[in-house]
Amino acid sequence: SLTAKDKSVVKAFWGKISGKADVVGAEALGRDKMLTAYPQTKTYFSHWADLSPGSGPVKKHGGIIMGAIGKAVGLMDDLVGGMSALSDLHAFKLRVDPGNFKILSHNILVTLAIHFPSDFTPEVHIAVDKFLAAVSAALADKYR
């Protein structure tokens, strides 16, 4: 679980990166050709004409994802309750396999490390990794 120190580190780091969140989201979603290399992710976006990194739909959805993660930063004391509507959406309407959250979380960490090398210290890495795992768990809450 997230400690008070973890929460403080995540909030401070998010303050530094929030201006580039859309770019980070688009790159994370497109990293390693996530939507084409992992067949299980491709099925959720079959209605997009272009799944390539940098395409309009990938950029837009990456921004939406990072916007939701930004909101989650303010909900760290109750991620399950605060993200309940998103959990419902992903579990019941979109039927996203929660294993995909782990792939995306990894891609977000890699993208943050690339864009913010001096700020992405080991302490930040650990706190953000724990935070993204907590967000993933909150999103997967309705799957049980």
Curated annotation (Swiss-Prot):
This is Hemoglobin subunit alpha-1. O2 binds at H61. It comes from Oncorhynchus mykiss. Residues 1-144 form the Globin domain. It holds the Pfam family Globin. Heme b binds at H90. Keywords: Acetylation, Heme, Iron, Metal-binding, Oxygen transport, Transport. CDD domains: Hb-alpha-like. Transmembrane segments: none annotated. Coiled coil: none annotated. The keyword Transport applies. The gene is hba1. It comes from the Eukaryota. The modification N-acetylserine is found at S1. Red blood cells. One of its GO terms (molecular function) is oxygen carrier activity. Heterotetramer of two alpha chains and two beta chains. The lineage of its organism: Eukaryota, Metazoa, Chordata, Craniata, Vertebrata. Disulfide bonds: none annotated. Belongs to the globin family.
